[in-house]
Amino acid sequence: MWITQEITPYLRKEYTIEAKLLDVRSEHNILEIFKSKDFGEIAMLNRQLLFKNFLHIESELLAHMGGCTKKELREVLIVDGFDLELAHQLFKYDTRIDFVQADEKILDSFISFFPHFHEVKNNKNFTHAKQLLDLDIKKYDLILCLQEPDIHKIDGLKRMLKEDGVFISVAKHPLLEHVSMQNALKNLGDFFPITIPFVAPLRILSNKGYIYASFKTHPLKDLMTPKIEALKSVRYYNEDIHRAAFALPKNLQEVFKDNIKS
C-alpha cells in the first residue's frame, strides 16, 4: 500500500505503508495514522504528513529558535496546530505555555503518536484553550503559529507580543514555492521590522518553510550560544543548525532581497 504526500500542486511523494492504524474525522480535520517499515508511524493530517521518527526536528528547531534568541522565555503561545512535542521542548525553559486548539477530538487522537503527550498535558504550566478568547489577557515572549496566518491573524497576534517578543510562523518552502514565501514575508513585513525566512536543514521529508519575525530581536545577532550549549536531550538542534537554517542560495537571495527585513 502507498500514501501520497502533496509537496506542491505539481510535485508529490509516495511512501510505502504496511497498515492503517487509526482513522479519525472531525468537522474540520481528518487524521489517519499508518504503520511504515522505513519511517515508523506516519500521521496524515489533512494531507500533510508527520513522521513519528522525525518529530523532534521541527519541534526542536522552532522551540529553540525562539528560546535561544531570548534572554527570558516566560510566556509562550502556540496556535493553529497539534504538535505537543513543541511544548515538550519549550518546557526546557522556565516557561508557561498557552496552547490554542479547538479540535479536541483530533488532538486527543494523537495520544499514542506524540511520545510526550501525557507529560505535556499534565504539566502544571500547560494550558489548553479552545480559542484565544478563553485565555487571560497577557503579553507573550514567543508566539508560534503552526499554519500560515493571514494579515488579520498577524495583526491580532502581534498585539499580544512583548516589545522584544518573537513571532514564528509556518510558511511555504522558499525553494519549492518562492512566490508564496514572498507573499508571506510581505504580509509579516507590514507589521514587523525584522522578517527573515528559514528552513530545517537536512530535513528531506518536508515541504515547510518558516518565518522569524520580531520588533527588536534578531535570530542571528541575538543568538545566545551558552543557552544552546546548556540544552539537554536534543538530537537535532545546535548552533550550526540554527545558523544554517537562515542560509539562502544566491538565486533566492536575489528573489527575496526586497522582502527580507533584518
Swiss-Prot record:
Transmembrane segments: none annotated. GO terms for molecular function: spermidine synthase activity. It catalyses: S-adenosyl 3-(methylsulfanyl)propylamine + putrescine = S-methyl-5'-thioadenosine + spermidine + H(+). Residues 1-249 form the PABS domain. Its main location: cytoplasm. GO terms for cellular component: cytosol. It is an enzyme of class 2 (transferase). Catalyzes the irreversible transfer of a propylamine group from the amino donor S-adenosylmethioninamine (decarboxy-AdoMet) to putrescine (1,4-diaminobutane) to yield spermidine. This is Polyamine aminopropyltransferase. It comes from Helicobacter pylori (strain J99 / ATCC 700824) (Campylobacter pylori J99). The lineage of its organism: Bacteria, Pseudomonadati, Campylobacterota, Epsilonproteobacteria, Campylobacterales. The gene is speE.
